[in-house]
């Protein structure tokens, strides 16, 4: 990246050197994600040959992330990338939106993101995409044969929950993704010797 001494400028020169095959983060397209934090607001385009324009576009979008939950007023203008013609805007936006949502959930402190709030976030996402949400809450874990989740969750005034998000037609192949959404974890008790972990 060439930091020009004057603003506004006509172009930005960016070079990342040779990519290391063992390190995917060294790809020039991934390194492009550093620019939105460095450049002034405006609309930018990719010039020259870009080996993977979709990866470059996603990296730019991920680099433009800002956590704003506790900020008031208008969001600061951010640098925007005009997508190359070969990039599908819906796919690119879907990837970026998904990562931004995950970052927002992670960056929200446990005092504001407990099991109930996490379920609310899941229901909001489900509504937006036509998915169905069911949950198992508190003592219902015993009825559904999840005694350990119930036992651990009893240590909190906020009951634990299992949140199940289902999307897609019944006829589609079934794919299950399992994630562990820990809203707050003190690290637990060291009940086992380190050799048993």
Identify the residue ranges that each predicted region occupies:
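N-terminal hydrophobic/helix-forming segments and targeting peptides
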Residues: 1-183, 191-196
